[in-house]
């Protein structure tokens, strides 16, 4: 099971003494802006993919779209008091034993100023030495075949992207991709690290890929990426990604 995504973003308000309000949204719904709000900076994080079983690949992190700290996409102009629809889906399920592939994570969608921004769920990890990782916001790690592609569908910086990176393909049981780096960057089965941001003094680390699994008899675990990626296990079922970070599940 992978960690689901969410929305984090400072809301810029207009008043005699301009203030900035940060709102974190972890569930779907229609959220009403304050009447003084004129623009919104956002970070949208999709749900991570599930890890594969039987030395399966790690799940890819959920895609990340953001206007915050993005020179190519300014804060989105909005009308004060407007409703903002948000959809946040669940993380992908881990693969059934023996040898099942992980499921892709769900998308996160936010509608601001008439524009819909959709971050793609992470790709599921490949299964039991026989399948590649799934494509998604960040790609799932391979078990057989090839690693999943990240930033799928492609989102340029002007639309808040890129969403993420590819899964790892160095070995069977490769780590899932994270927002900050591809899977297997920090080791053969390690999940890719996510992205670290500080918003109004509060640090967030998001969208790490899940660690990959290994053949029966290999000891220990393979680490998930920073940002909620679940650890892969070389002897048992991998761990889930951390809730509300978009982290991928371990293989």
What are the functions of these language-model segments?
Residues 2-30, 39-251:
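Low-complexity, glycine/proline-biased repetitive segments and flexible coils/loops
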């Amino acid at each position: 099971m992978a960690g689901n995504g969410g929305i984090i973003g400072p809301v810029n308000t207009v008043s005699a003494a301009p203030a900035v309000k940060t709102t974190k949204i972890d569930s779907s719904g229609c959220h009403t802006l304050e009447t003084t709000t004129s623009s919104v900076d956002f970070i949208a994080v999709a749900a991570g993919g599930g890890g594969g079983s039987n030395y399966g690949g790690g799940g890819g992190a959920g895609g990340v779209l953001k206007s915050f700290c993005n020179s190519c996409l300014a804060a989105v102009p909005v009308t004060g008091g407007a409703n903002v629809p948000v959809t946040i889906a669940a993380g992908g399920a881990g693969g059934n034993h023996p040898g099942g592939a992980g499921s892709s994570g769900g998308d996160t969608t936010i509608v601001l100023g008439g524009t819909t921004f959709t971050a793609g769920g992470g790709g599921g990890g490949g299964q039991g030495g026989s399948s590649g990782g799934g494509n998604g916001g960040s790609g799932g790690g391979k078990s057989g075949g090839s690693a999943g592609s990240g930033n799928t569908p492609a989102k340029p910086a002007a639309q808040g992207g890129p969403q993420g990176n590819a899964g790892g393909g160095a070995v069977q049981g490769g780590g899932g991709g994270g927002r900050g780096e591809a899977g297997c960057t920090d080791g053969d089965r390690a999940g890719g690290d996510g992205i670290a941001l500080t918003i109004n003094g509060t640090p967030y680390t998001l969208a790490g890929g899940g660690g990959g699994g290994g053949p029966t008899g290999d000891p220990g675990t393979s680490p998930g990426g920073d940002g909620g990626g679940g650890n892969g296990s070389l002897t048992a079922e991998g761990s889930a990604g951390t809730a509300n970070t978009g982290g991928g599940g371990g293989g």
